[in-house]
Amino acid sequence: MKTPEVLVVDDFLEQEAWDRLLNQVQCDEWTQSQPDDKYWHITDGANYKASKRFLRDAPFNDNYDIWADAIRAFADSEPAQEYVAGYTDIAMRCHGYPVGSKNPWHTDMGGVTYSYYLHKHWQINWDSMLLVLPKDSVEYKQMMRKLPGTKQQDTYAGTGTLEMFEQAEKQKGLIEHGMGYFVAPKPNRLVLINKNVVHGITRVDKDAGENVRLTITGFFNFFKAQVVNV
């Protein structure tokens, strides 16, 4: 599927490559996202992330080289170049969303990003759907406006910060428009999300049980001096 907002590719990896990559991420260093990581709000539930890597540092001499080769080949392909022409680097990190976790509405700070669904099994009623609003359908600014005298102390000091508590006004336009489409977290599916696309991820339902929504995600960087470190 190709739209102005997303490019979706199913059966992205061969079975052996998929198996080896899933095996590799289980040997990474993992941490739980903290409240200071304002991409997730306090009420969004616990989620987990592995260590981050960048394509520029490949080869890694482990099974992440499988992903580095695959995402580079994809980015250089004709379908993807419409979205990522001129990229200079690609970030890669595994995220885990267990039952009760979600990701709120955002625009990835206006950047081009991707998500690859690494988990082996998923049911449609387990939710954790990617929700997408049509481009330019709403006016939405991800960064919080700082009032006079406010000094930023968090890890987003170089880029601006995001609201922790006052989100209702920002989200008013989303509910007023109230229409879009979803992309299910189908195993072995890659989704490229275009720049300035408003999107969110619904909560993992309790029906998922012990199953965790696993993704390899990252930004495409376009400037030699720019490294989007999220």
Regions found by a protein language model. Give the residues of each.
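Non-heme Fe(II)/2-oxoglutarate
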Residues: 1-80, 102
